[in-house]
A protein has these predicted regions:
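Anion-binding and metal-coordination hotspots
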Residues: 1-332
Length: 332
């Protein structure tokens, strides 16, 4: 279908699913594999109502995702003990392989199931199979970025702290309270607040050298807050557990599709996009600069793109077949 460029992925997905349901003879033999834009109550409700199977990524904004990951770590605190579902080579030849480990759990999702005779959709909390997957690659990415996050938070606090230090507080309680909101915003550190007491010598009312025997200038007491930062190891460990995992949701039962197959089908998205040319087609260089103004022209261009991709894929298929038959690649 033809949608506005501002149409959300959720709305577009629902339209595509409705069209697929009319085209495919037996939806029960179809598994829709998609990213997290597929996972919302109405879209999953339509999938279930149409009889499609699905595998998708649970968005980070869903509370059930965090709960499932916490449950997985609670049952097996060391990821090495999680079953290996898939592996891929490391970034360099000398690097060890990167593993995907995980297992299935039960989660509940709020669905909007279709009703008969165009009646309002029925809200229902349905149990779903959720596969919690630990990725060595994601864990490594978190570890690599951690020091930068710690440094940025420290620098941000120091910058804000300078503004607090420019103020003078009449009592220790006020000085400590001024640092409270800053410390509460810390994500990667814990802050220990202390208060220093200082005596400030006031300026004399008259300029010049004071006369002999003049009383000393008056002083006043001010309080200055200080904060000492330490890494919050508990917060870092909790963030590492969440960042190193992702959660897939599917309606396939474990005795029908193993955890290995669910993960493999989801990972095949990248293969489909990369080998068919859709990744290039989705890029801004291919689509964004084209302004055709009318729906008819847009449909025509879409048809031309589809024919071009078919020709491209046929050439790629023929070339790969020839390379395999000859047992050698193509020299660049």
């Amino acid at each position: 279908g033809l949608h506005s460029g501002n149409t959300s992925d959720h709305v577009a997905n629902r339209d595509h699913l409705s069209r697929l349901a009319d085209l495919l003879p037996d939806p029960d033999e179809v598994t829709v594999v998609a990213d997290c834009k597929l996972v919302d109550g109405e879209t999953l409700g339509r999938l279930t109502g149409a009889g499609f199977h699905f595998v998708s990524l649970v968005p980070k904004t869903f509370g059930v995702r965090e709960e499932l990951i916490d449950q997985a770590w609670a049952e097996a605190p060391d990821a090495v003990d999680w079953p290996i579902l898939a592996s891929k080579p490391g970034g360099k030849k000398t690097d060890p392989p990167l593993h995907y480990r995980g297992r299935s759990f039960a989660g509940r999702f709020a669905l909007q199931l279709p009703a008969e005779d165009d009646a309002p959709r029925v809200a229902s909390h349905e149990p779903m199979r959720c596969l919690v997957v630990h990725s060595d690659a994601l864990a490594g990415r978190f570890a690599k970025a951690l020091e930068g996050k710690l440094a940025r938070e420290t620098a941000a606090l120091k910058k804000t702290h300078r503004g607090v230090l420019a103020k003078e507080f009449a009592c220790a309680a006020d000085a400590e309270a001024a640092m409270g909101p800053l410390v509460k915003r810390l994500k990667w550190h814990t802050g220990t607040v202390s208060v220093d007491q200082k005596e400030i010598v006031e300026k004399r009312s008259q300029r010049g050298r004071p006369p002999k025997g003049a009383p000393p200038p008056p002083t006043r007491t001010v309080f200055v807050p200080r904060v000492v930062l330490e890494r919050d190891e508990d917060a870092i460990a909790a963030a590492r557990r969440q960042a190193s995992c992702f959660v897939l949701v599917t309606d396939w039962a474990e005795d029908e599709w193993s955890d290995e197959r669910v993960l493999a089908e989801y990972r095949h998205q990248a293969i489909v996009e990369g080998h068919t040319g859709f990744r290039w087609l989705k890029g801004p260089a291919a689509v964004a600069p084209v302004f055709l103004e009318t729906p008819t022209r847009i449909r025509a261009l879409g048809f031309v793109f589809m024919i071009a991709l078919m020709v491209r894929n046929f050439i790629q298929f023929t070339l790969r077949g020839g390379m395999k038959k000859r047992g050698r690649g193509v020299r660049h």
